Swiss-Prot record:
Function: Functions in nuclear protein import as nuclear transport receptor. Serves as receptor for nuclear localization signals (NLS) in cargo substrates. Is thought to mediate docking of the importin/substrate complex to the nuclear pore complex (NPC) through binding to nucleoporin and the complex is subsequently translocated through the pore by an energy requiring, Ran-dependent mechanism. At the nucleoplasmic side of the NPC, Ran binds to the importin, the importin/substrate complex dissociates and importin is re-exported from the nucleus to the cytoplasm where GTP hydrolysis releases Ran.
Record Gene3D superfamilies: Leucine-rich Repeat Variant
Protein name, UniProt field: Importin-5
Main localization (coarse): cytoplasm
Domain Importin N-terminal positions: 28-99
Chain residue ranges for the region called Ran-GTP binding: 325-375
Organism: Mus musculus (Mouse)
Length: 1097
C-alpha cells in the first residue's frame, strides 16, 4: 500500500514536470511518462483526477493525458484490461463527474467519458456502455445544473453515442434538446444545447429526413446564437458557420431568419470584430455551399454588400505607411481584409450577374467620397470582384479602366496604391484582352506612377502592377514600348541602387528587378539590345547583397539574371554565363548554412533549372554541386499532427499550422512551411530530366526513389503532379543504361502509378498521373504489364467509366432540384468538362496499350467493352460519343484484322456519326473509316464502299471549311484518300480522284496532311493520267497544292514525303517550258514557298 502511495506521489511530481516551463525538465518528464505501461498510466491518471486535494493544474493535466491515451491508444490499452477493471473505470468516471465541483475540470472529465463512449460502440453500432447512456438521460433532467451541463457536454462531444439505437431514441433526443434550449434561467444550458444540436446535425449530415424532423429546433438555435454573442461567447456562432459549410440544406426552412440574424450581428459595432466577421462568414459560406438557395434572397444579399464595404473602410491612419521598407503581411484579423476576402468569395459564389448590379453604384459613390478611406475601399472592392464578375465586367471594362487610371493621380498615396492594386488585378483577371485593349494607357500611367519618389510603397506597387501586365502581355504588343520601358526601369534601378547604398532601402528595387525580369521574359530575343545595360548592375547586386535583410532582393536578382539569360539566348548570354555560374555556385556552397525559410532557396532552385535550359548538355558538369541541395529540398517532410478538437484549439494561433476537420472531434494538422519549396524542387527535377535526357542518368535511381512515394503526397497537388510528370522522363533518361536497368526502374514505379490512378482524389492531378502512365507504356512497349497489373488496371478503368456515367446521372438529378438556375448549370458544365477530361485520359491509356500490345490485349479489353459501347449510344452527349469512337478507332488501327470481331458494335454508329452535328464526333468517325480502309482487312471492304458517299457529303457541305468544321472535313478527305489507296477495288477511283484533288491541300490536321501528300506522291510517281492530266496540264494545280502545303507548314521537312515532293518539283524544273508555265500561275508567296521546299528538303 505504502509502495503504491509512493508511486502515486512520484506520478504527481511527474505531472508537475510535464507542465514545467524548463524545456529540459519537460522533455525528460515526457520520456518518463511514455515509458510507463498503459494499464499503470490509466490507474495513476484516474487516481490523480479523483484526488481533489491535488493541485488543480496536475488534475487538469491528468485529465487531458487520459483523454489522449483513450483517443490515440485505446486498442492497445483498454481491451487488455481485466473486465472488472474496465467496469471500475467506467463507474469511477461517472462518479467523478457527479462529485466534481469545478466546472472546467468537470468538462475535461466529460471529454474522457465521451472518448471512452466513442470507443465502446462496436462494429455493429451497439453501445457497450449502457450505464453511460442511463447517466446521460438521468443527468439531462436533473435539477443539478452541473450534471445537466455534463450530459450536454458529453452529447456535444460524441453525438453518435446512441449507436444503432439512435432512430429509436430520436424523439427523446429531440425533446431533450428542445427542453434545454428553452431553459430561460441558465444561459450556459441554452448555449450547450445549441452546440449539441449543431454537433448532432453535423454528425448526421447525409440524413435528410432527420433535418426535417429537427427543423423546428432552428428558431431556438438561432436565438441561442444571438444570446451567446451578447454574452461574449462565439461558440454557437461558430457552430452555425459549420452548419452553413457542411449541411446548408438544414437551414432552408429558416434561411431568411438565419440571414437576417447574421446581418444584424455583422452590422453591430458593439460586438467585437471576430464575432462580426464570423456572422459575415455565415452568409459568405452559404454563397459558396448553397449559392442557388441563397440567390433567391436577393434583398438580403443586397443588404450584405454595404456591410462588407463598410468593413473595408475600417482602416487606420499610419504616418509611416508610405515609406515603410518591409512589406508587413496584411493584418488578416482586420475588418478591412475580412471584408475584402468576403466580397471576393461572394462574387465567385453567387456570380457577377447578381453581384455586379448590386455593388456597382456603391463603388461609384465610394470613389467620389472626400475621405480617402472610402476611395481606397472602393478600388480594393473593384479588385476583389474581378474574378467572380468576370463576364459582366468585361462589357464595361473600358469605362472601369478609364476611371481607375484617374486614381493613380489621387492626392492620397494609399488611394494611389489601391489604384495600382486594381490595375494589377485586372491585368491578371482579364488577360490578355485587357493588355490588347489598354496597353497604351496602362503602360504610360504605371510608368508615371513609378516615378513617385516620395512614396516608395506606391512606387513598388506600380512596379508590381507592371509585372502583372507584362506577364500576360502578347510579345507583339510589348515590343513597341520596349525602349520607353527599359529607359524608365533602368533609371529607377540606378536611383534605387544608390538609395540602397546610402539608406539601406530596398523595397522598390526588389519590385523593379522583377519588373525587368518580366519584361525580358515576354520580349525574349528582342531584349538583346538592352542586355548590357542591365547585366553588370544585376551581377553587382548578387555579389554584394549578402546581408540577411537583403536575401529577398538577392533571390529576385538571381531570378532576373536567369530569366534575361533565357530570353536573350545562349549566344548573347555566354559572355556572362561563367561569371553567373560562379556566383550561383558560391551561393550554392553557402546553401547548407541557409535557414529553411531563406527566400533565396526557391529562387536558386528555379535559376539552376533556367541555366540548364540555356546551357543544355553543358550544364551536366554542374549537377554534382546542384543536386545535393535540390534533393534535400525535394525531400522536405512536413510536420503533421492528428489532434482532437480541444488540442487543436490550443494550437490554432500557432504559426504556420493548417487544420482539416476530420469529424468525430478529430482534426489533422500540417505545418505548411517548406511545402512550396518542395514543390518547386520537384518541378526542377522534372526540368533536368527533360532537358538533359541521358546526361541525367547518374541521378535517375535516387530521383525515382524520391518521386514514386510522392505520388501519395496528399499535402500538395504540385508535388504529386511533378512526381507523375517525372516518370516517363526518367525512363527516357535511363534507356541509355540498357534494358535491364530500364525494366527494374519501370517495375519500381509501375505498381505505384496504377494504384495512384485508383486513389487520387483531385481530378487535375489524376489526369496528369493517367497521362504519364500512358507515356510510360509507350516508352516501355509490349510486355511491360504483367497479369496482376492488367487485372488491377482493368478494375480501375472500369470504375472510372462507371463513375463517369454515375456523375452524369447525378447532374441530371441536380437539374431537377428546386434551387436549379443558370448559374448552377454553369457549375454543372464545369463538372462535366472535368469528367470528360478524365475520359480523354482513359482513352490515352487504352491507346498506349493497344499500340503496344496489338490484338493480344483484346481478351482483357472485353471487360470494358459494354461501357465503351454505352459511350457511343445516340442519346449520350457528344464528348462521350467522340471518345468512345476514338477508342474503337484505336482498336481498328492497332488490332486488325482481329478487330472485326467487335464490328457489330461500332460499324453502324461510325457510319452514322460521320454526318453528326458535332464536328468532334464527325472527325473521330471519319478517322475510324480511314484506318478501317488502311488496316482493317478484307472484312471491312463493303463498309468502305458504304462510307464513301457519306464522306463526300460532309466534304461538299456549304460550311465544311469553317474554323469549327475544318478538322473534321480534312479527316473525311484523308479517309477518302485512304479508301482509294488501300481498298481501290471498293470504289471507282477514276471517278473520285478529280474531286479528291480539288479538295487538297490539307493544312489544319498536320498528321493527315502527311498521309494525303504521301498518296499524292504515289500517284504522281506512277504517272497517274488523271492526276497529271492530258499533256501534264494538271501540274500547275499540283504545284499550287504543294506550295499551299508548304506555306501552312503541313509539309514537315524531316519527313521522307518532303523529299519526294521536292523531287517532283525538280523533275519539272529540268523541262524548261513546263516549269515556266507552272511557276507563272503561282503567286509570289507560293513561288517563295516552292523555293523554301527546294532549299530545305
Amino acid at each position: 500500500m505504502a509502495a503504491a502511495a509512493a508511486e502515486q506521489q512520484q506520478f504527481y511530481l511527474l505531472l508537475g514536470n510535464l507542465l514545467s516551463p524548463d524545456n529540459v525538465v519537460r522533455k525528460q518528464a515526457e520520456e518518463t511518462y511514455e515509458n510507463i505501461p498503459g494499464r499503470s498510466k490509466i490507474t495513476f491518471l484516474l487516481q490523480a483526477i479523483r484526488n481533489t486535494t491535488a493541485a488543480e493544474e496536475a488534475r487538469q493535466m491528468a485529465a487531458v493525458l487520459l483523454r489522449r491515451l483513450l483517443s490515440s491508444a485505446f486498442d492497445e490499452v483498454y481491451p487488455a484490461l481485466p473486465s472488472d477493471v474496465q467496469t471500475a473505470i467506467k463507474s469511477e468516471l461517472l462518479m467523478i463527474i457527479q462529485m466534481e465541483t469545478q466546472s472546467s475540470m468537470r468538462k475535461k472529465i466529460c471529454d474522457i467519458a465521451a472518448e471512452l463512449a466513442r470507443n465502446l460502440i462496436d462494429e455493429d453500432g451497439n453501445n457497450q456502455w449502457p450505464e453511460g447512456l442511463k447517466f446521460l438521460f438521468d443527468s439531462v433532467s436533473s435539477q443539478n445544473m452541473g450534471l445537466r451541463e455534463a450530459a450536454l457536454h458529453i452529447f456535444w462531444n460524441f453525438p453518435g453515442i446512441f449507436g444503432n439505437q439512435q432512430q429509436h431514441y430520436l424523439d427523446v433526443i429531440k425533446r431533450m434538446l428542445v427542453q434545454c434550449m428553452q431553459d430561460q434561467e441558465h444561459p450556459s444550458i441554452r448555449t450547450l444545447s445549441a452546440r449539441a444540436t449543431a454537433a448532432f446535425i453535423l454528425a448526421n449530415e447525409h440524413n435528410v429526413a432527420l433535418f426535417k424532423h429537427f427543423a423546428d429546433l432552428l428558431p431556438g438555435f438561432l436565438q441561442a446564437v444571438n444570446d451567446s454573442c451578447y454574452q461574449n461567447d462565439d461558440s454557437v456562432l461558430k457552430s452555425l458557420v459549420e452548419i452553413a459549410d457542411t449541411v446548408p440544406k438544414y437551414l432552408r426552412p429558416h434561411l431568411e431568419a438565419t440571414l437576417q440574424l447574421s446581418l444584424k450581428l455583422c452590422g453591430d459595432t458593439n460586438l467585437n470584430n471576430m464575432q462580426r466577421q464570423l456572422a459575415l462568414e455565415v452568409i459568405v459560406t452559404l454563397s459558396e455551399t448553397a449559392a442557388a438557395m441563397l440567390r433567391k434572397h436577393t434583398s438580403l444579399i443586397a443588404q450584405t454588400i454595404p456591410q462588407m464595404l463598410a468593413m473595408m473602410v475600417d482602416l487606420e491612419e499610419d504616418e509611416d505607411w508610405a515609406n515603410a521598407d518591409e512589406l508587413e503581411d496584411d493584418d488578416f484579423d482586420s475588418n478591412a481584409v475580412a471584408g475584402e476576402s468576403a466580397l471576393d468569395r461572394m462574387a465567385c459564389g453567387l456570380g457577377g450577374k447578381l453581384v455586379l448590379p448590386m455593388i456597382k453604384e456603391h463603388i461609384m459613390q465610394m470613389l467620389q467620397n472626400p475621405d480617402w478611406k472610402y476611395r481606397h475601399a472602393g478600388l480594393m472592392a473593384l479588385s476583389a470582384i474581378g474574378e467572380g464578375c468576370h463576364q459582366q465586367m468585361e462589357g464595361i471594362l473600358n469605362e472601369i479602366v478609364n476611371f481607375v487610371l484617374l486614381f493613380l493621380q489621387d492626392p492620397h498615396p494609399r488611394v494611389r496604391y489601391a489604384a495600382c492594386n486594381a490595375v494589377g488585378q485586372m491585368a491578371t483577371d482579364f488577360a490578355p484582352g485587357f493588355q490588347k485593349k489598354f496597353h497604351e494607357k496602362v503602360i504610360a500611367a504605371l510608368l508615371q506612377t513609378m516615378e513617385d519618389q516620395g512614396n516608395q510603397r506606391v512606387q513598388a506597387h506600380a512596379a508590381a502592377a507592371l509585372i502583372n501586365f507584362t506577364e500576360d502581355c502578347p510579345k507583339s504588343l510589348l515590343i513597341p514600348y520596349l525602349d520607353n520601358l527599359v529607359k524608365h526601369l533602368h533609371s529607377i534601378m540606378v536611383l534605387k541602387l544608390q538609395e540602397l547604398i546610402q539608406k539601406g532601402t530596398k523595397l522598390v528595387l526588389e519590385q523593379v528587378v522583377t519588373s525587368i525580369a518580366s519584361v525580358a521574359d515576354t520580349a525574349e530575343e528582342k531584349f538583346v539590345p538592352y542586355y548590357d545595360l542591365f547585366m553588370p548592375s544585376l551581377k553587382h547586386i548578387v555579389e554584394n547583397a549578402v546581408q540577411k535583410e537583403l536575401r529577398l532582393l538577392r533571390g529576385k536578382t538571381i531570378e532576373c539574371i536567369s530569366l534575361i539569360g533565357l530570353a536573350v539566348g545562349k549566344e548573347k548570354f555566354m559572355q556572362d554565363a561563367s561569371d553567373v555560374m560562379q556566383l550561383l555556385l558560391k551561393t550554392q556552397t553557402d546553401f547548407n548554412d541557409m535557414e529553411d525559410d531563406d527566400p533565396q532557396i526557391s529562387y536558386m532552385i528555379s535559376a539552376w533549372a533556367r541555366m540548364c535550359k540555356i546551357l543544355g548538355k553543358e550544364f551536366q558538369q554542374y549537377l554534382p554541386v546542384v543536386m545535393g541541395p535540390l534533393m534535400k529540398t525535394a525531400s522536405i517532410k512536413p510536420e503533421v499532427a492528428l489532434l482532437d478538437t480541444q488540442d487543436m484549439e490550443n494550437m490554432s494561433d500557432d504559426d504556420g499550422w493548417e487544420f482539416v476537420n476530420l469529424g468525430d472531434q478529430q482534426s489533422f494538422g500540417i505545418k505548411t512551411a517548406g511545402l512550396e519549396e518542395k514543390s518547386t524542387a520537384c518541378q526542377m527535377l522534372v526540368c533536368y530530366a527533360k532537358e538533359l535526357k541521358e546526361g541525367f542518368v547518374e541521378y535517375t535511381e535516387q530521383v525515382v526513389k524520391l518521386m514514386v512515394p510522392l505520388l501519395k503526397f496528399y499535402f500538395h497537388d504540385g508535388v504529386r503532379v511533378a512526381a507523375a510528370e517525372s516518370m516517363p522522363l526518367l525512363l527516357e533518361c535511363a534507356r541509355v543504361r540498357g534494358p535491364e536497368y530500364l525494366t527494374q526502374m519501370w517495375h519500381f514505379m509501375c505498381d505505384a502509378l496504377i494504384k495512384a490512378i485508383g486513389t487520387e482524389p483531385d481530378s487535375d492531378v489524376l489526369s496528369e498521373i493517367m497521362h504519364s502512365f500512358a507515356k510510360c507504356i509507350e516508352v516501355m512497349g509490349d510486355g511491360c504489364l504483367n497479369n496482376e497489373h492488367f487485372e488491377e488496371l482493368g478494375g480501375i478503368l472500369k470504375a472510372k467509366l462507371e463513375e463517369h456515367f454515375k456523375n452524369q446521372e447525378l447532374r441530371q438529378v441536380k437539374r431537377q432540384d428546386e434551387d436549379y438556375d443558370e448559374q448552377v448549370e454553369e457549375s454543372l458544365q464545369d463538372e462535366d468538362d472535368n469528367d470528360v477530361y478524365i475520359l480523354t485520359k482513359v482513352s490515352d491509356i487504352l491507346h498506349s496499350i493497344f499500340s503496344s500490345y496489338k490484338e493480344k490485349v483484346l481478351p482483357w479489353f472485353e471487360q470494358l467493352l459494354p461501357l465503351i459501347v454505352n459511350l457511343i449510344c445516340p442519346q449520350r452527349p457528344w464528348p462521350d460519343r467522340q471518345w468512345g469512337l476514338c477508342i474503337f478507332d484505336d482498336i481498328v488501327e492497332h488490332c486488325s484484322p482481329a478487330s472485326f470481331k467487335y464490328a457489330e458494335y461500332f460499324i453502324s454508329p461510325m457510319l452514322q456519326y460521320v454526318c453528326d452535328n458535332s464536328p468532334e464526333v464527325r472527325q473521330a468517325a471519319a478517322y475510324g473509316l480511314g484506318v478501317m480502309a488502311q488496316f482493317g482487312g478484307d472484312n471491312y471492304r463493303p463498309f468502305c464502299t458504304d462510307a464513301l458517299p457519306l464522306l463526300v457529303r460532309v466534304i461538299q457541305a456549304p460550311e465544311a471549311k469553317t474554323k469549327e468544321n475544318v478538322n473534321a472535313t480534312e479527316n473525311c478527305i484523308s479517309a477518302v484518300g485512304k479508301i482509294m489507296k488501300f481498298k481501290p477495288d471498293c470504289v471507282n477511283v477514276e471517278e473520285v480522284l478529280p474531286h479528291w484533288l480539288s479538295w487538297l491541300p490539307l493544312h489544319e490536321d498536320k498528321e493527315e496532311a502527311v498521309q494525303t501528300f504521301s498518296y499524292l506522291c504515289d500517284l504522281i510517281e506512277s504517272n497517274h493520267p488523271i492526276v497529271l492530266g492530258p499533256n501534264n496540264t494538271n501540274l500547275p494545280k499540283i504545284f499550287s497544292i504543294i506550295a499551299e502545303g508548304e506555306m501552312h507548314e503541313a509539309i514537315k521537312h524531316e519527313d521522307p514525303c518532303a523529299k519526294r515532293l521536292a523531287n517532283v518539283v525538280r523533275q519539272v524544273q529540268t523541262s524548261g517550258g513546263l516549269w515556266t508555265e507552272c511557276i507563272a500561275q503561282l503567286s509570289p508567296e507560293q513561288q517563295a514557298a516552292i523555293q523554301e521546299l527546294l532549299n530545305s528538303a
